[in-house]
């Protein structure tokens, strides 16, 4: 139960990153999650991917997990620079920004990201 006496939402937001340029998980990537309200962005979580390219905990869950528009920011340029990849300045994809909607507080939203220095792909996973 939440503090308001209502049942806790069962949904959660998870993500993982795969480095398609090197064929491995994207580890050590800083990810920021924002809630979007009109033109305002509210930072609600910051995390790093582990050696499997996943976050150790859901990026969002519990009472904070509610319907709305969200934005995940993946710091891909920093990841590739740390791996010694030569990137142009400015990098073509320094940050990958994904804006998406959560319609149900009871669903699992999994947002995988496949990245390379010059492309990315995403989808709603399971």
From Swiss-Prot:
Could you say which EC number(s) this protein's record lists?
3.5.2.17
MF GO annotations: hydroxyisourate hydrolase activity
Reactions performed catalytically: 5-hydroxyisourate + H2O = 5-hydroxy-2-oxo-4-ureido-2,5-dihydro-1H-imidazole-5-carboxylate + H(+)
Q: Where does substrate bind?
A: 16, 54, 123
The superkingdom listed in its UniProt entry is Bacteria
Q: Which residues form a coiled coil?
A: none
An example GO biological process term is:
purine nucleobase metabolic process
Keywords carried by this UniProt record: Hydrolase, Purine metabolism
Looking up SUPFAM superfamilies in the UniProt record yields: Transthyretin (synonym: prealbumin) (SSF49472)
Family assignment from sequence similarity: Belongs to the transthyretin family. 5-hydroxyisourate hydrolase subfamily.
Q: How is the quaternary structure described? A: Homotetramer.
| Known function | Catalyzes the hydrolysis of 5-hydroxyisourate (HIU) to 2-oxo-4-hydroxy-4-carboxy-5-ureidoimidazoline (OHCU).
What else the UniProt entry mentions is: HIU hydrolysis also occurs spontaneously, but more slowly.
Protein name per UniProt: 5-hydroxyisourate hydrolase
């Amino acid at each position: 139960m939440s503090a308001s006496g209502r049942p806790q939402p069962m949904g959660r937001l998870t993500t993982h990153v795969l480095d398609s340029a090197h064929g491995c998980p994207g580890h050590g990537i800083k990810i920021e999650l924002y809630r979007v309200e009109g033109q305002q962005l509210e930072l609600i979580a910051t995390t790093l991917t582990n050696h499997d390219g996943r976050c150790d905990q859901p990026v969002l869950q519990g009472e904070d997990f509610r319907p709305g528009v969200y934005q995940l920011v993946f710091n891909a340029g920093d990841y590739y620079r740390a791996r010694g990849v030569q990137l142009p300045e400015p990098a073509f994809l320094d940050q990958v920004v994904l804006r998406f909607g959560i319609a149900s507080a009871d669903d699992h939203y999994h947002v995988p990201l496949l990245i390379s220095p010059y492309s990315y792909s995403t989808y709603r996973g399971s």
